[in-house]
Amino acid sequence: AFSSARMAAQMAYQTDKKIIDFQQMGFFKILFAADDTTILKSYEQQLLGPLEEHDQHHHSQYMETLRSYIENDRSLMGVAESTFTHRNTVNYRIQNIKKILNNPLKTAQDLFPYQVAFYIRDMKL
């Protein structure tokens, strides 16, 4: 019980939420249970590092676009609306992201590793 409470408190702190119920932590339970956070950081960097590096050198906003693409269930219109970007620009960015990541980003299985990587990033380890 103590470790569950500690995990929930840690998640609340690291995700800027006021209160977190351990039962509602869902997938985050697995991430917060990892004793070696360097593995999580390495995983996140391995997946998102190439996009982050591209953004830094080209001001391309690919990280924001990929996150929105995941959050909007691969809807280009959803990404366009949530990022205030033209649909054609979103399509162009997604095509480039696919090339950089060498991933078709077509299925939930293609996107899940990147969703996990964003979760890890949000944990502020």
For each of these PLM feature ranges, what is it?
Residues 1-125:
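Cytosolic nucleotide-utilizing catalytic cores of signal-transduction proteins
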